[in-house]
A protein has these predicted regions:
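Cysteine-cluster motifs in flexible loop/terminal segments that predominantly coordinate metals
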Residues: 29-52, 637
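Dinucleotide-binding Rossmann-like beta1-alpha1 core, especially the glycine-rich loop
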Residues: 110-190, 199, 434-435
Length: 688
């Protein structure tokens, strides 16, 4: 059951889980976590592992012609793709970045809003509450973790109480249920740590929260498991209208470091068979020379030995780009991991954020390796902040996306007890909902976001110090007692705000075979499952034949299992507890990330799923390895290097081909592991 009034919130994965919106203690989790994965014995399952930069091809397509192409693999694209997997259709999902959920989905609050704030009659209002009500059942099927914790809009004076009353009426108009205004006495029983000046609040018990990228990953996995094809690192550069559909030109890019690692020198091209032939020919030459007395008899053995030694040396000094062997010790691979980025690096720009942020082509120093042609009967344009550019490719200029930046600060789990509900100030008529204070599913306290329109220089050009001051000072008005020195991470997302002021969910007026799902800003995550149903309806109206897929399986196994402290787990130096990738009992005990207690088995489980993974960042989003207090500090437990080594062992990729966690990405912190002086600066900015 859910947390009691005034009690500290549960932490997902710690002695239990949130499942379908409610809390389950560990002893009640057996039905959720038992038999969660087909037993895998290493290379016996290797044929099921997805190739690089794509899932396994769709059985319903020839690789070029598809019924539907979905552009964008955030929570909207993933939700739509999963819904389409319920039908006998060939579906291709294209993502410009190096993983699913790398755009706005990665950089937001993860709130499943109730829908009381949305203007009646808009798409926001139409789909938010409907989507909200779909989350409990979705989580029961997909196990991404959903907490129905409720939200509170706080009022500090009578004028603001009037705003609460207006919000209550608006919510009821939108069909939102169970809303009520809570007076001060009951409010402080619910939330004893809020600002003592608060006198009332609007309570929405049906609001909840998820980890947004874990939600999108679950949707995408289940879609691919049911036949949808995914290709990552695919930038759509052109769309041509044809009589029989739409033809897309797609650039497949890869990081330059990966391309260089695949290059083979002439000496590396010499294989073992070729060396044997060379050795045989050299021996014949020497033997012939000896017969003709051109080679002294006593020198023959020495010359033969020299030739053989040379051939062996060539193979040792210039090995081919072979796969990493499964029996390579993890300790040996960790030593090859290289330095972990924690300072310097390239800052992510707004243009980068439109196409995947830290996972985009520019930040990854990518180069086109292939240009693909894809044909589709219908195209779903859910490319986030890039969706207006996709529309322009067919001559549709009916909307424009102007990204709005939202900055956040993430605090340690030891601050998570300060609230159980999601806390908002009274909304500003211009700035909207305002900053929030919330305890995440995993127990961290999250503060933010800002609302910086990129077309306003004074907002877009705010310094890191100004952004931090804005967040901390505003959040202090909600919960005065949090400690900013417990900040462990900072990030920013770009909301795809359209010039129409509402979500755009419609057939293109230029060509009805393209359906726009654009400008999906807040509360888009809450509305995503309902939006997916609407897209299916539009497709059917447009002539897309929908026949139920009799083999559709709605279930997806979780990756992370709940833990009771260190019970049954083992920590140690690299190599002490590492397995060979075959002993699942040993892997389930071996802790790879100390702060988050991520096990080797959880990393392996993520790698053996249907989505392509070739970076520690992708594993981080699926298992939380590197997301804890130390943020992957190599001086602590070196978890990022350990994860990189496991990726190499499981996939066979050389360490040089495995991506890491980029820095600084969108952080307002000066380095990944902030020094005491920077944390003290945060404290002073809170009190300025």
């Amino acid at each position: 059951m859910s947390a009691n009034k005034g009690s500290a919130p549960h932490q997902h994965g710690v002695k239990g889980v949130y499942h379908g919106g409610e809390w389950l203690d560990m002893e009640d989790c057996d039905g959720v976590f038992s038999n969660i994965e087909e037993k895998c014995s290493g290379c016996k399952n290797e044929g099921k592992c997805p190739p690089r930069s794509r899932s396994r091809p769709s059985a319903n397509s020839d690789g070029t012609n598809y019924d539907i192409v979905v552009i964008g693999a955030g929570c909207i694209g993933a939700a739509i793709s999963r819904e389409l997997a319920k039908y006998k259709l060939s579906v291709l999902m294209l993502e410009a970045s190096d993983d699913v959920s790398q755009g706005a989905t990665k950089g937001n609050s993860g709130i499943v809003h109730a829908g009381y704030d949305d203007k009646p009659g808009t798409n926001h209002a139409k789909f938010c509450w409907t989507g909200n009500q779909m989350f409990p059942d979705l989580d029961k099927d997909l196990n991404f973790g959903y907490q129905k914790n409720g939200s509170l809009v706080l009022a500090t004076n009578k004028d603001e109480v009037g705003i609460l009353e207006d919000l209550l009426k608006r919510g009821e108009t939108n069909g939102v249920q169970n809303l009520r205004i809570v007076e001060k006495k009951e409010l402080f029983e619910m939330e004893p740590h809020i600002n003592p000046n608060v006198i009332a609040a609007l309570y929405a018990p049906d609001a909840g929260n998820v980890i947004p990228y874990e939600f999108a990953i679950a949707l995408a996995e289940n879609a691919v498991d049911n036949g949808v094809e995914l290709r990552i690192r695919r930038e759509v550069t052109g769309i041509t209208r044809k009589d029989d559909g739409l033809e897309l030109t797609v650039n497949h890019w890869e990081p330059k470091a990966y391309i260089l690692s695949k290059e083979v020198s002439p000496l590396q091209k010499i294989g073992t068979t070729q060396l044997i032939i060379l050795g045989f020919l050299a021996s014949l030459t020497l033997w012939a020379g000896a017969l003709m007395n051109l080679v002294p008899a006593g020198a023959f053995p020495k010359l033969m030995g020299t030739i053989l030694a040379f051939l062996v040396l060539v193979k040792v000094l210039f090995p081919g780009k072979s796969k990493v062997e499964r029996n390579t010790p993890i300790s040996e691979l960790v030593n090859q991991a290289g330095a972990i980025e924690g300072s310097g690096g390239t800052k992510v720009s707004v243009d980068d954020m439109k196409v995947g942020g830290s996972g985009c082509r520019t930040i990854q120093n990518g180069e086109t390796v292939e240009t693909e042609t894809v044909k589709a009967k219908f195209v779903i344009n859910c490319a986030g902040s890039y969706s207006d550019k996709i529309a322009n490719m067919i001559g549709d200029k009916s909307f424009c996306i102007k990204p709005r930046l939202g900055d956040y600060l993430l605090l340690n789990r030891n601050q998570g007890h300060l609230t159980t509900k999601t806390l908002f100030p009274c909304p500003d008529p211009i700035l909207g909902k305002g900053v929030l204070v919330q305890t995440t599913l995993w127990g961290n306290l999250i503060l933010g976001p800002t609302a910086r329109d990129v077309y306003k220089p004074e907002a877009a050009n705010m310094t890191a110090a100004e952004v931090q001051h804005y967040i901390l000072s505003k959040c202090k008005n909600l919960v005065p007692s949090f400690d900013p020195k417990e900040t462990i991470h900072a990030f920013c997302g770009a909301r795809a705000k359209s010039d129409r002021g509402d979500w755009i969910i419609e057939n293109s007026a230029v060509d009805g075979r393209m359906i726009h799902v654009a400008g999906i800003d807040s509360p888009g995550l809450a509305g995503s499952p309902a939006i997916a149903l609407e897209v299916v309806r539009l497709l059917e109206e447009s002539g897309c034949k929908l026949t139920a897929n009799p083999t559709f399986n709605p279930r997806r196994a979780p990756i992370i299992t709940p833990k009771d402290g260190m019970r049954g787990l083992k920590m140690g130096s690299v190599g002490k507890n590492d397995s060979d990738g075959l002993d699942e009992a040993k892997m389930s005990q071996n802790v790879i990330c100390k702060c988050e207690k991520v096990t080797e088995l959880e990393v392996v489980r993520a790698l053996r799923r249907s989505l392509p993974i070739d970076s520690t960042q992708a594993i981080r989003k699926r298992t939380r390895a590197g997301m804890g207090h130390c943020q992957g500090d190599p001086a602590n437990y070196n978890c990022e290097a350990r994860v990189k080594a496991i990726i190499a062992r499981e996939t066979g990729m050389p360490m040089s081909q495995i991506g890491g966690r980029p820095w600084p990405a969108t952080s307002t912190l000066s380095q990944r592991w902030p020094e005491e002086s920077e944390l003290k600066d945060l404290e002073s900015r809170m009190n300025e």
